[in-house]
Amino acid sequence: MKKEEQNMTNYRYLYLVIFLFGILTYGLGLAQPAQAKQNQNIMSNSFNSQVVNKARYTLSDETNGRMFLSSEDDFTSALSEFDLQARMKSLEKVSKAEYLKFAGAAARNWTPDERQKMMKAASKLQAELDQFSISLPDEILIIKTSGAEEGNGAYTRRNAIILPEDYVKKTNDVQMEALLTHETWHVISRYNPELKLRMYAAMGFTPCSVQFPQALLPLKITNPDAISYSYCYQVTRQGKPVKVAPFQYATKPYDDGTKRKEFFQYITSVMNAVNRKHEAVMVPSLLEVGGANNILNVWDVEGFDVKTFGTGYLIHPEEITAEHFVKILKKDFTHPLTEKLAKELQTTKKS
């Protein structure tokens, strides 16, 4: 066969292969189930995603953020009368439906610069998280809000990290990475309950049966990152050991007619003293002169302080753990508790 004929034959074979490949891939595309195509569309619309241990950080747009924030979950079910009024800055009682609508309306879109900033932080965090065998949801949403729905604080719900726009604008790259790491721990904790309890136990916290004092129920302040206050820690009071469960409540009903105060300004962090059977004593002594000592302030006991835990964020073992999680990933082992928790986390390392 002549060289020219050989070349022509080769081209024909090449065209045939390309043609057959095109038909095959087109057929496979038609054979995709409707749900798979829908998922493909969702994936393509989820801009700036970063895979983390089988999970994907996704910046939620305003529409999806509104849908997420206006839906019910464990957090919204736990909200007290004060929670609802203070978040909406209302002197009148607020219904759950009113709050959900209000929360949804706080969702905002991301600017191009914000997207770049967030994904830079997520990329660094991925490299750190990849070493651990931890369960994560398929998708970790990052929702930007006006901040009005949660007193301009960063928080989590289910598989979402919610950040107020002021935080997003004002934090530098290092601060954003630390903030995203802290909030990511709450998602990890939620999806890894056994790991969470091991980390709590390493700090000295154990599950216990605690009933919130009845007189304070309407004033209870709910932390979306940790809605349960049923974790006890042994401290010393007047030379004697006593188990306490930290919790938060408002000093008084919401009464700000100017609508300038955030609910954080009403917070009192105290501890509920429990007996050996882990049953809560329900008389709030500090609110009733001469009452039994059942509600204690942090300064009323020894062993529940910054020196003990290496952080001033003492409102819940979940927040203490999140602070140390940031230090672990930064390899800052200045405080001995950080190293202790790091060793516990090592048990989840990939082999």
Residue ranges of predicted features:
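Active-site scaffold of zinc-dependent metalloenzymes
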Residues: 148-177, 181
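Bacterial N-terminal signal peptides
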Residues: 17-27
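Boundary at the C-terminal end of the N-terminal hydrophobic targeting segment
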Residues: 31-36
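Metalloprotease/metallohydrolase-associated module, dominated by Zn2+-dependent proteases
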Residues: 201-342
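N-terminal mature-domain "stem" immediately C-terminal to a signal peptide or N-terminal signal-anchor/transmembrane
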Residues: 37-112
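Catalytic Zn2+-binding segment of zinc metalloproteases
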Residues: 184-200
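Auxiliary, metal-adjacent structural segments of Zn-dependent hydrolase domains
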Residues: 100-157
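Bacterial N-terminal signal peptides that target proteins for export
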Residues: 5-17
